[in-house]
Amino acid sequence: MIKKLKEIPFFKSTEMKIAEKTLQQINDLEPSVVNLTDEELQNKTDEFVRRIQEGETLEHIRPEVFAVSREATKRVLKKRPYDVQMLGGIILDLGSVAEMRTGEGKTITSIAPVYLNALEKKGVIVSTVNEYLAERDAAEMGEVFSFLKMTVGVNKPSMSPEEKKQIYQCDITYSIHSELGFDYLRDNMVTNINDKVQRGLNYILLDEVDSILIDEARTPLIISGGESSSSYMYEVANQFARTLQPGDYEIDEESKTIKLVDSGIDKANKFFTLSNLYDIKNSELVHRIQNALRANFIMKKDVEYIVKDEKIELIDAFTGRIMEGRAYSEGLQQAIQAKEFLEIESETKTLATITYQNFFRMFKKLSGMTGTAKTEEQEFIDIYNMRVNPIPTNLPNIRVDDEDSIYWGTRQKLNAILKEVKQVSKTGQPILIGTSQIEQSEQLHQLFDQNGIVHTVLNAKQNEQEANIISQAGQLNAITIATNMAGRGTDIKPSKEALAVGGLYVLGTDKSESRRIDNQLRGRSGRQGDIGYSKFFLSLDDQLILRFAGADKLKEIFPKSEEALNSKQLKRHFSNAQKKIEGFNYDSRKTVLNYDDVIRQQRELMYSQRDLILVSEDLLFVIERMVFRSVDDVLKNSMFLLKNGGFDYTKLTEYINDQWLKPFDFKFEESKLSHLHEKDLAEYIFQNLMEQYMIVRQRLIDSFGEDSILYHERSILISTIDSYWQNHINSMDKLRSNSNMVQYAQKNPYQVYTQKGSKKFERLIVEIALQSSVKLFNNPSAYRQDQMEEVMIEGYTQEFIDKIPESEREYFKTLPQDLKSKIVKNLIQLEQSIAMVESNDQSQDLQSITIDILPDQNLNNSSDEAK
């Protein structure tokens, strides 16, 4: 009932009721704000910050802040935000999605909520889909923010950590969405807490929110490292795939999955000389074969990817853009390289990963704006707890959205499009033709060339000319073929002459996987109350029908014809197929989230443990916990238990002495351990191990100082956690791939993944504790003075680098390591000498104890080393 009420125009959400009430308050304040001088208007920022610090809430000061923001925007940009833009801004501050049609001024709408949340001085992030938009919006809107005493920065992938840290310290940071996620992952790989660049996840406003949170939700962010692997198996798997006939495998068109049938399995057993392909020992080979099948029979060139400069470049299915720097994971990239006979790169090892869904859900407040999101509202509610609020247009929408025309086959559809373009172009009306695949755009390109129709093509292959092509698409006589216009950041503005002949004509050549994407294409026409027209030309050969509506059966029902098949039944088939694939894609995204939620809980525990180690000034409590966990695990190990009960004390004693006490004089005695009550054994071993560790630790502190020992302990703990965690997430990746194989045994893959993943994580915690404690007890640098000095110098070197002025820091890093060590070693001696003087309260001239920082007095003063 509630859902039906929301579809009635006069039904308003709670957010919209709040927004309208607040808008009235803003408008009531406007006369008084207009009379403020520039200085008085600017000083309002200081007043708002003070009031927030004194306890006022953002909600309480929202009307005043929005009124000030509106006036500042009017004075700086010479544009007074419309009431509907203020409504949109309030919705954004409420942590919801503002659905605003193309051309309604989303960028200006963002100013007020960003300004309001930046007043908390905790940092606000505005995320865009590409770097061009981030720089453009930061430059244009930054003028308003600067006027209001707010600092603005742009986060770029090319920046150094030092530069990024400064950018994140700004009141407002603009960034592409992927870089935010990568910065978060990198922050959780640092070995010094001061090297983190982000300062907390407070408030984020996502432009094109549906593109980021829906379309890209299935693509996890991954930081990878090189891992040696032979290209031979990819090539062999590809050779096998090329021997198969269509009857050897089965493709599920709906899910785009593929599997071998009995004849294919028999061929695999013969090809690889196996008795049973699906034996557990062959799981790695099955994974390679599965990727080869996907690469050869599912992944299509110029649809999912292109080959450019002998490299595989991925295509964003929703925007048509090349996804720079992206690659398929889990060996699929290498399988496609083998298919295309390209050089096969090493398969990478995952070092850190997170999905967009789980990353953005960590923000204290999340909001977004887009032209189309209402059709996906349930997903926004279920996953992000965000409602979608359509914002009224400033001027009525007068674009005409015509009925779809459906044709029997591709040839008939193309002929109809050609005829329509010829007819419409006679008046000079600009035409934008939207295709979903590069292959379609190039088909039309050839057809138009053959018929002498002057046109321009925009797809992933011409991505570099995008801005120029789009800027001309609204001019008289312009005919533009574009692959997936969704996500394009530049508005098409029809010229006066074009508006006089009907405005922009949007012609869709097929339905996409989402009504939302189709609505975005339509929305390119009729911006800001302009006249416009849209129409879709479809056929029974379109991918949507082939995958989800049984094209062959429909072709049997409807006789072949050159004219459009005007049938309500057919239109229902297209509509139902689109809803079906929307549901399938939602389930797919939900599955990705479910699997990532398992690793998310583990990741949060690992990252919190890491942070605890990085910030703690005393790590003994961590070390004690790890030693006790290790001892407890050893005593539960079956190799030390006798069949008739009790322990094999000989083995147990040898193992503990060998693992922890090699460098120590103290050793456990079998006779002593065997006389203890079993329940007291763990505590006794733990207490004695820690006692020995503390003796040596104190001796090292006396020699080298507590800071050096802390640095040494921290380094061992962090490096062990990182190494084992990285191995774990790669193990979890393989577990997920292999868990799909249990479907053959009628088991639930997700349940298998969850159960086995939990056991793996429990073991991971124990292994980290065991290896960390063993390294701390046995690391040679703790007992050899020369190596301990190296550890100490390494720690001081980083501390010294942090103190160097930024202008000189990079130069110091380029010096030879031995010279850096000598400089820092001398500085340590100098610090110790000064400390000695201060502690003895001596007043002697410090010059008398100053040593030469540069060790070699004979260095030429003009040399790099002297500098």
UniProtKB/Swiss-Prot annotation:
Family matches, as SMART domains: SecA_DEAD, SecA_PP_bind
Database matches in InterPro entries: Helicase_ATP-bd, Helicase_C-like, P-loop_NTPase, SecA, SecA_DEAD, SecA_motor_DEAD, SecA_preprotein_X-link_dom, SecA_SF2_C
SUPFAM superfamilies registered for this protein in UniProt: Helical scaffold and wing domains of SecA, P-loop containing nucleoside triphosphate hydrolases, Pre-protein crosslinking domain of SecA
GO terms for biological process, alphabetical: intracellular protein transmembrane transport; protein import; protein targeting; protein transport by the Sec complex
Broad class of the protein's primary localization: membrane
Residues that bind ATP: Q85, G103, E104, G105, K106, T107, D491
Protein topology in the membrane: Peripheral membrane protein
Record field: catalytic activity: ATP + H2O + cellular proteinSide 1 = ADP + phosphate + cellular proteinSide 2
Keywords, comma-separated and alphabetical: ATP-binding, Cell membrane, Cytoplasm, Membrane, Nucleotide-binding, Protein transport, Translocase, Translocation, Transport
GO cellular component terms listed in the entry, alphabetical order: cell envelope Sec protein transport complex; cytosol; plasma membrane
MF terms (GO), sorted A to Z: ATP binding; protein-exporting ATPase activity
NCBIfam families xrefs: PRK09200.1, secA
PANTHER family: CHLOROPLAST PROTEIN-TRANSPORTING ATPASE, SECA INNER MEMBRANE COMPONENT OF SEC PROTEIN SECRETION SYSTEM
Family the UniProt entry places it in: Belongs to the SecA family.
UniProt function note: Part of the Sec protein translocase complex. Interacts with the SecYEG preprotein conducting channel. Has a central role in coupling the hydrolysis of ATP to the transfer of proteins into and across the cell membrane, serving as an ATP-driven molecular motor driving the stepwise translocation of polypeptide chains across the membrane.
Name this polypeptide is given: Protein translocase subunit SecA
Organism from which the protein derives: Mycoplasmopsis pulmonis (strain UAB CTIP) (Mycoplasma pulmonis)
